Amino acid sequence: MTNSNLRTENHFDYVKIKLASPERVMEWGQRTLPNGQVVGEVTKPETINYRTLKPEMDGLFCEKIFGPSKDWECHCGKYKRVRHRGIVCERCGVEVTESRVRRHRMGFIKLAAPVSHVWYLKGIPSYVAILLDMPLRDVEQIVYFNCYVVLDIGDSKDLKYKQLLTEDEWLEIEDEIYAEDSTIENEPIVGIGAEALKQLLEDLNLKEVAEQLREDIATSKGQKRAKLIKRLRVIDNFIATSASPEWMVLDAIPVIPPDLRPMVQLDGGRFATSDLNDLYRRVINRNNRLARLQEILAPEIIVRNEKRMLQEAVDALIDNGRRGRTVVGANNRPLKSLSDIIEGKQGRFRQNLLGKRVDYSGRSVIVVGPKLKMHQCGLPKEMAIELFQPFVIHRLIRQNIVNNIKAAKKLIQKADDEVMQVLQEVIEGHPILLNRAPTLHRLGIQAFEPKLVAGRAIQLHPLVCPAFNADFDGDQMAVHVPLAIEAQTEARMLMLASNNILSPATGDPIVTPSQDMVLGSYYLTAIQPQSKQPKFGDYSNTYASLEDVLQALEDKRIDLHDWVWVRFSGEIEDDDELQNPLKSETLKDGTRIEEWTYRRDRLDEDGSLISRYILTTVGRVVMNHTIIDAVAATS
């Protein structure tokens, strides 16, 4: 974030997400009070006192750490009122401030033993396994206390660095090391759990490993080369972000603000609480128990079991169910972990950040609009008047049709002709955005020029359907109105449907006729076997131009699949063109008439075409005439 302004929350350049160091995690939650006391560490699993219903000190809802639960009031009640703003109570240590600080002040839990972060260990791909160049199964055996790993071989010739040892194998090696006739001076060092993992990650010199990998990639090929490139890419990213691999092992856990995991009193005097509080409580209980066991120098097997339980508690807090048994609450419902809150359709991003309700938007069912141009869409009047209401009110007042906003709203409710006229002026040249969920690529949102239509359905040009993956069996689309001039310009220049002909993914045309259009084109040009072909010279079925045929169709004198003879001077493609005519006759004036299967040509003495009649169906005339018109309009 830029430091140019004190109100940094409104002035920042970009948001960067990267690994946090243990110091950074503690920095988020730690604060020094004016009396020099450092607060921020949550050490007790309690939430609120069952008698006073006030938060317990140093617990998950502690007022000293997170701020007061009532505005301008400390925990013990010595200071009340806004005039004591900023004072820290000398009795309870709570700062007198607004209660809303409990929505952003964080705490932390200092862990008695390091634990691995489940995202980096069990994610796909597993970054810990890639960095250490070890199989994921082996890394899991270390973290969950099933196997030892060799951290330093010492003087032993039989051991290898990063070799896995079972309990029995390590006991045998220990017996050899401590035997009376042992010649080993430097003992091999082994480790187990997340501490061993942290040591392995600390021992990595990223720059040296990256250099070595580049040399190996140059000489290797196939599957091995792909694996090396994968590892190098991860290492380069760590170097680029100045992150240390050992940060993937946690020494401290952030505790999110209490108002984001609230505890609410219900009518019967019972409490409803967020699942996160239960998950945090498990972590704190196990952490405190582990610290106590280490303090009293408990047997290693008990301490190790407690460390494994702490690792599982932290795994459940970060991503419940990712590994091992899912932690369940009352009535066997899995508890919602931090990952569950963030991810998925109901998660924080898709539901609350991207899926926000926005002003100047609406949604309706889509129907086909065959008379629309490709860059147009039909917008129901009812919807348009609601979406463009501020613009309409502004124009009504400016044109002195009404004097104030209240009168304008009344006029709009009546759906007066004047209002519709003004609405028409407002939407002229004002593009709107149409979006169909799910928006899987950028063509899921496109801009259109609105045309007012009756009814309550949005009309859409059939050619833009493939881009939206839309069909007309009840699909709904959302409408958004770009307000700023810049947004309108961008919509018109970049997002207009007629500018998005090619798919951004493949470069192939995405605007292709499909479904109804293909069926319509086929039906239009199809030949019906029962339709009789008229003889040449049958004046009731002979027309002077394509326009005459269209006029006759409009007047219902002929049907789409009727055969007609029509004069046509353009280029034609005929199956029997390469063969000789069926019949050729020279007239007295020197001109020649050639009979072909589907045409009659009259040629002069030099062989130049004088006139041509072709035998075709009315539907094909319609198709041909439409294409000629469209090509002529664009050229």
Swiss-Prot record:
Which SUPFAM superfamilies does the annotation name?
A: beta and beta-prime subunits of DNA dependent RNA-polymerase (SSF64484)
The positions annotated for binding Mg(2+) are 471, 473, 475
Q: How is the cofactor bound?
A: Binds 1 Mg(2+) ion per subunit.
Q: What is its EC number?
A: 2.7.7.6
Q: Does the keyword Manganese apply?
A: no
What are the recorded Gene Ontology BP terms? DNA-templated transcription
* Entry's Gene Ontology cellular component terms: DNA-directed RNA polymerase complex
Please list the cofactors this protein needs: Mg(2+); Zn(2+)
Decide whether keyword Zinc is in the record. Answer: yes
Which residues does the record give as Zn(2+) binding sites? 74, 76, 89, 92
Reaction it catalyzes: RNA(n) + a ribonucleoside 5'-triphosphate = RNA(n+1) + diphosphate
GO MF term list:
DNA binding; DNA-directed RNA polymerase activity; magnesium ion binding; zinc ion binding
List keywords of the entry alphabetically: DNA-directed RNA polymerase, Magnesium, Metal-binding, Nucleotidyltransferase, Transcription, Transferase, Zinc
What InterPro entries does the database record attribute to this sequence?
A: DNA-dir_RpoC1_gamma, DNA-dir_RpoC_beta_prime, RNA_pol_asu, RNA_pol_N, RNA_pol_Rpb1_1, RNA_pol_Rpb1_3, RNA_pol_Rpb1_3_sf, RNA_pol_Rpb1_clamp_domain
Q: Which Pfam families match?
A: RNA_pol_Rpb1_1, RNA_pol_Rpb1_2, RNA_pol_Rpb1_3
UniProt cross-references to NCBIfam families, sorted A to Z: PRK02625.1, rpoC1_cyan
What role is this protein assigned? DNA-dependent RNA polymerase catalyzes the transcription of DNA into RNA using the four ribonucleoside triphosphates as substrates.
How is this protein organized at the quaternary level?
In cyanobacteria the RNAP catalytic core is composed of 2 alpha, 1 beta, 1 beta', 1 gamma and 1 omega subunit. When a sigma factor is associated with the core the holoenzyme is formed, which can initiate transcription.
Which family is this protein grouped under? Belongs to the RNA polymerase beta' chain family. RpoC1 subfamily.
Task: Cite the HAMAP family for this sequence.
Answer: RNApol_bact_RpoC1 (MF_01323)
What this protein is called in its record is DNA-directed RNA polymerase subunit gamma
Source species taxonomy:
Bacteria, Bacillati, Cyanobacteriota, Cyanophyceae, Synechococcales
